[in-house]
Amino acid sequence: MMSALFCDATHELDAIGLRCPEPVMMVRKKVRLMADGETLLVSADDPSTTRDIPSFCRFMDHTLVASETEQAPYRYLIRKGQ
């Protein structure tokens, strides 16, 4: 079941079927076009995203608002900026 948080995302990115490094590259490209405070819901099934997306958020100073990583497809809600 998808958390209500995920339903309110400003933007969505479907990275299902893509493998490292493609999902994070797509996230970076999409976030660059967003305004500060907007959110991005990312869906992915590459296990490396469970490590790479949180690292991307820390490194680029974005906020990982929520994540569901118990089983694929994984979901991440990223807020641009802090």
From Swiss-Prot:
<dbReference type="GO" id="GO:0002143">
    <property type="term" value="P:tRNA wobble position uridine thiolation"/>
</dbReference>
<keyword id="KW-0963">Cytoplasm</keyword>
<dbReference type="GO" id="GO:0005737">
    <property type="term" value="C:cytoplasm"/>
</dbReference>
<dbReference type="InterPro" id="IPR022931">
    <property type="entry name" value="Sulphur_carrier_TusA"/>
</dbReference>
<dbReference type="InterPro" id="IPR001455">
    <property type="entry name" value="TusA-like"/>
</dbReference>
<protein>
    <recommendedName>
        <fullName>Sulfur carrier protein TusA</fullName>
    </recommendedName>
</protein>
<feature type="active site" description="Cysteine persulfide intermediate">
    <location>
        <position position="20"/>
    </location>
</feature>
<dbReference type="Pfam" id="PF01206">
    <property type="entry name" value="TusA"/>
</dbReference>
<comment type="similarity">
    <text>Belongs to the sulfur carrier protein TusA family.</text>
</comment>
<dbReference type="GO" id="GO:0097163">
    <property type="term" value="F:sulfur carrier activity"/>
</dbReference>
<comment type="function">
    <text>Sulfur carrier protein which probably makes part of a sulfur-relay system.</text>
</comment>
<dbReference type="InterPro" id="IPR036868">
    <property type="entry name" value="TusA-like_sf"/>
</dbReference>
